[in-house]
Amino acid sequence: MGKPKFYDFCVHAVPDGDSTAQEQVSLGRHFGFSGIALANHSDRLPDRKPILPFIEGFEVFRGIELVEENPSKLHSLIGKFRNSMDVLIVHGGSEAVNRAALENPRVDILNHPAFDRSSGLNQVLAKAAAENGVAIGIILRPLLHSRGSRRIRLLSDLKSNLELARKYDVSLVLCSDAMSCFDLRSPMEMLALAEVCGLEEDEALEAISTVPEKIIAKNRPGPGYIKKGIEVLEGEDLF
């Protein structure tokens, strides 16, 4: 088995974050990632579609984190942005939005599902996530910036969601959710933090390597791909 590749699939840049896309990408490369997804919130997008920074040997994925409280409008946003994005994230935070995201197979990741006194997930939603291939984001920035009762609540919600993810085989994605270069952490730091938060070593590794790779493979299919269930075969005797 080769050396694993590490990815951070939720990084924000100007005008959503405080650091430029080039700064975030350069630091991500320096930290040892193989790639990051620049995923600004949909209500903080630049006026023009930005040109992604280029660094040889490093992948920069085009992403978005959709923010919409109305499920019907959320589905419209998913349809609007899906085909132009490598990584499509929904910013949760209510039962209606969480359900809309987890029941839609065109969504890659649900971030920030918790609301009120709920962790944001239950058995029904966890089953929907597993059936539709929607991963749950394990977001580090809120944990790093919180203290006291707020951090205790975040860890409690995370524990509840981890139990459901394990029971129903829901994929997890480990993300920094960095709003500036000061929020970025190296892959080794993120793995260590994930284990402190309750993930097993193999779970954390899958969440920062294997699952992101599967998301990109799904959204960037190979040249022989036409549509789901159909593939062009070359160089083979078909009869």
Curated annotation (Swiss-Prot):
Keyword Nuclease in annotation: yes
**Main localization of the protein?**
cytoplasm
Q: Does the keyword Nuclease apply?
A: yes
What reaction gets catalysed by this protein?
Endonucleolytic cleavage of RNA, removing 5'-extranucleotides from tRNA precursor
Q: Under which EC number(s) is this enzyme classified?
A: 3.1.26.5
Q: Which Pfam families match?
A: RNase_P_p30
Q: Where in the cell is it found?
A: Cytoplasm
Please describe what this protein does.
Answer: Part of ribonuclease P, a protein complex that generates mature tRNA molecules by cleaving their 5'-ends.
Q: Subunit structure of this entry?
A: Consists of a catalytic RNA component and at least 4-5 protein subunits.
Belongs to which family? Belongs to the eukaryotic/archaeal RNase P protein component 3 family.
Q: Quote the protein name from its UniProt record.
A: Ribonuclease P protein component 3
> To which species is this protein native?
Methanosarcina acetivorans (strain ATCC 35395 / DSM 2834 / JCM 12185 / C2A)
